[in-house]
């Protein structure tokens, strides 16, 4: 009798082990299936924020996600690396949200001026005018001798004021070798030096003092206005 009881106990233990193995396999199969299905979930929405020059479509294509690939397999690092190959793009931040949404935050280089269809950016790099940018000051002088300082200084001009400048001419005199003339879209003329370039950011206030007349604004020295005779 004792031997039979031992045999039954062994059989029961073996059955319990088999059940455990079976349930473990089922569990692993379910986990694997869920992971496979989740991995197959594609990107459903792509949001591009902060770009003004580079089009959304180009950003998505350059990032390598224009075919809306697997959300999980999409690498944020890869997107950043690909996008920063574009000379116009300064910084990129990527966020993945809600298991299917990609947010791409773009910081572009500031466009300083245009010369011979070459765009000068705020990092002192000249690039091709790939995006046909025209609402930017045209540089009509050779500034090679002070290019770096010119770029650094002009980049301090507020964007809305930069849009008001039609042309920039390098016009040094005996007093200041860093003197420039800004020809405004409204017909006014501004003399300024690189060291005092931020004064132009108050242009709207200065312009209001002209009361609709045209004039020459001297911000290089004296800060006064010479009204043009009509």
Residue positions per predicted region:
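N-terminal positively charged amphipathic segments used for targeting/anchoring
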Residues: 1-38, 174-230
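Extracytoplasmic/secreted envelope proteins and their assembly/folding machinery
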Residues: 56, 60, 76, 80, ...
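Extracytoplasmic segments of membrane-associated envelope/inner-membrane machinery
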Residues: 104-177
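Second-shell loop/turn segments in exported
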Residues: 48, 65-69, 136-144, 188-194
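Extracytoplasmic
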Residues: 41-43, 54, 87, 97-101, ...
